[in-house]
């Protein structure tokens, strides 16, 4: 996984990548002669959401913080369930229909702990990790950005209108990077009164 950012610590592996996810690679990261069970969860982009056709999902993240959050979740779950190992990788960028956006693998001496830990890792990741997704709908629907958690309320994105009207701050328009991942450190405010 060439363009991955990863953290590895005490039987925990976490990563963010723009590449395709490989389930076998992730299973091998937790494989051990001490483990009697390996559980794999693969979150896959489906073709609909709320009765609307989905074209693709796009994910963005505050990567340094997201990696730390993922590692913290993995370490907590590793100890809580007495796991052998745990690994979690989240894909960023465009994830087409039928492709995985997240893989979580856990290994344990016994299957019950592995099942419980895998589900808990997923729920914690969706609740706490700094990853956001844009659901791109087919037809005239456009897209909606939302937190990467079940039931999160999204904000409709109209690409044409978004480009036409800048957000207004107290000192004038706020200029933002034009696409996720573009360089920039938050909104830039141009003060028209100061001529900057």
UniProtKB/Swiss-Prot annotation:
Compartment(s): Cytoplasm
Pathway(s): Cofactor biosynthesis; molybdopterin biosynthesis
Family according to the record: Belongs to the MoaE family. MOCS2B subfamily.
Cited SUPFAM superfamilies: Molybdopterin synthase subunit MoaE
InterPro entries: MoaE_sf, MOCS2B_euk, Mopterin_biosynth_MoaE
Organism: Sclerotinia sclerotiorum (strain ATCC 18683 / 1980 / Ss-1)
Keyword Transferase part of the UniProt annotation: yes
Protein name per its UniProtKB record: Molybdopterin synthase catalytic subunit
Gene Ontology CC entries for this record: cytosol; molybdopterin synthase complex
EC identifiers of the protein: 2.8.1.12
Root EC class: transferase
Residue ranges with Basic and acidic residues bias: 147-168
Cited function: Catalytic subunit of the molybdopterin synthase complex, a complex that catalyzes the conversion of precursor Z into molybdopterin. Acts by mediating the incorporation of 2 sulfur atoms from thiocarboxylated MOCS2A into precursor Z to generate a dithiolene group.
Keyword field: Cytoplasm, Molybdenum cofactor biosynthesis, Transferase
Recorded coiled-coil stretches: none
Catalysis performed (reactions): 2 [molybdopterin-synthase sulfur-carrier protein]-C-terminal-Gly-aminoethanethioate + cyclic pyranopterin phosphate + H2O = molybdopterin + 2 [molybdopterin-synthase sulfur-carrier protein]-C-terminal Gly-Gly + 2 H(+)
Start and end residues of each stretch annotated as Disordered: 142-196
